[in-house]
Amino acid sequence: MRIRRPFIQILILWFVLSPVWAWCEEKPLWELGAGLFLLQMPDYRGSDENRRYLLPYPYFVYRGDILRVERERISGRIFETDRVLLDISGNGSAPVSSSDNPDRQGMADLDPTFEIGPSLNVTLLENRQDHYKLTLTLPVRAAFSTDFSSVRHEGWVFHPRLVFQKADIIAGSGVSLGISAGPMFADRGYHRYFYAVDPPYATPTRRAYEAGGGYSGSTLTVGLNKNIKPFIISAFVSVDFLQGAVFEESPLVKNKYAVMAGFSVSWVFLKSSRMVEKRD
C-alpha cells in the first residue's frame, strides 16, 4: 500500500470519502477523535490502474449554525428552511504520477484537484416516524488543480443527485443506510484536464484526443454507518458508469466504469457537553 503525499489523508477523507448519513437528532456541538481508513480507488474515472491507501486520520466534527465540519464534508450554510438548504459543497481527486500509470507514460502528472461551490438541497420526502428521507441535491462547483506552488482553474462541474437516507434499516440494529445516484456534467476544461492527449504526447498506441464538455457519466453510491460507542464504523461503495460520456473515446479511458470502496473506524474520545440538532 502506498501513501504518495501526507496531504492526501485530508483530501480523501474530506472530499472523496462517500457520505454515510445519520438521521436528524441531537448531537454534541463538537467531537474529537482519531481513526483508520482503508480506501481503494482508480487513478481517475475510467483508468484501469487502482491504488489502495491505508491512512490514519484526525476525526473532527463541528455542528455550528453556519459552519458545519462533518466526516463527509465541510459546508457553510447560506440559507435554510424546513425543505430547502443552500450551502457550500466540496469534492476533489488524488494526484496521479504518470510514470506509475502505463496509459499516461510520458505525459504530465495529474496534480490533485479540489472543487468548491454552492449546493441547493431540496427535501422531497421525509418520514420521521419511519426514519427515512429523500433529498435532491444540486451542486455546482468550480474545479481547481494545484502543485502547492500555484492554483489553476480547470473548469466547472454540475452533479445533481437523489439521496435516500434510512436510519436503523433493521429494527434495533442501529445501522444507517445511504444511497445516492445521479448524472454528472462538466465543461471542456474539466474533461480536458483528465482525458485530453495533446499532439506532442501522442504515440502509436495513444492517439491525440481533444475532450469536449457535456455528459460526464453517472454515479451510484451505497454507504452504511453504525455507532458502537465510542467507535463509529463506516463503509461505502461508489460506482461511476461512463457509457455515453463525452470523453468515452479518449485513449486514456480503459474502463467504462470506475469503482471506489472504503472502510473506516473512528474512535471518538472527546466531545462537547452542549447538544445541538444534527441536520443533513
Segments the model singles out, each with a brief description of its role:
Residues 30, 50-56, 82, 110-116, ...:
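Residues that define the transmembrane beta-barrel architecture of outer-membrane proteins
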